[in-house]
Design a protein with these regions (language model features):
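A short local loop/turn or secondary-structure capping micro-motif enriched for an aromatic residue
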Residues: 69-73, 96-99, 115
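A short glycine-threonine-serine/GTX helix/turn-capping micro-motif
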Residues: 39-41, 108-116
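Hydrophobic alpha-helical segments typical of transmembrane helices
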Residues: 8, 76, 121-125, 129
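Active-site loop of classical SDR/Rossmann-like NAD(P)-dependent oxidoreductases
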Residues: 89-91, 112-123, 140
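Short acidic/polar mixed-charge low-complexity motifs
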Residues: 8, 57-61, 85-86, 103-105, ...
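Short polybasic amphipathic segments
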Residues: 78, 94-104
Length: 164
């Protein structure tokens, strides 16, 4: 919502699953972030896959996510699609920009030094304390995000689209 300039929520629909890694004894993977806590006799009651769609007053957002994806590829990105071009923002990395020039689709990939995101986050927080500026982590933004997350969980549980 922050990226969309404070877009207002209209509807959400979401599905969650706990299927791919339900049986840890038979689940095959290359690596896992919680490998050191694995308990083959434990209970897996965590959603391992999510898919959804969000409508706002400015744009729509579709998303998929999985920690157990069974495709052997780790990808974290956000695509911004528009009538003049598109951007793929790689999580905590660079981006590529697609546009049309002289009747041809062109890919541009700016090279620049990426600052430490945690340092920048800390600096923005401290500056906001001094200036009173409302940053992306201001409580109003966080509450909208929390409302969105709750609605996504509710939609998945009720298996229907929800309106705001």
């Amino acid at each position: 919502l922050y990226v969309l300039g404070g877009a207002k929520l209209k509807t959400v629909t979401c599905d969650t699953y706990n299927e791919m890694a339900k049986n840890m004894k038979d689940y095959v993977y290359k690596s896992m972030w919680a490998e050191d806590t694995k308990d083959l006799n434990g209970t897996n009651d965590v959603d391992d896959m999510v898919s959804g769609y969000i409508r706002t007053d400015k744009a729509s957002i579709s998303f998929n996510g999985a920690w157990a994806q069974n495709i052997g590829e780790d990808e974290m990105f956000v695509d911004f699609l528009g009538d003049k071009g598109g951007v793929r923002l790689h999580y905590c990395k660079d981006f590529e920009w697609w546009t049309v020039e002289d009747g041809a689709l062109m890919k541009k990939q700016p090279l620049y030094k990426i600052p430490d995101m945690y340092q920048k986050e800390d600096e923005a927080f401290l500056a906001a304390i001094e200036t009173g500026e409302h940053t992306k982590t201001h409580i109003d933004n966080i509450l909208e995000s929390a409302k969105l997350l709750q609605a996504l969980y509710d939609s998945a549980e009720q298996r229907k689209e929800l309106s705001f």
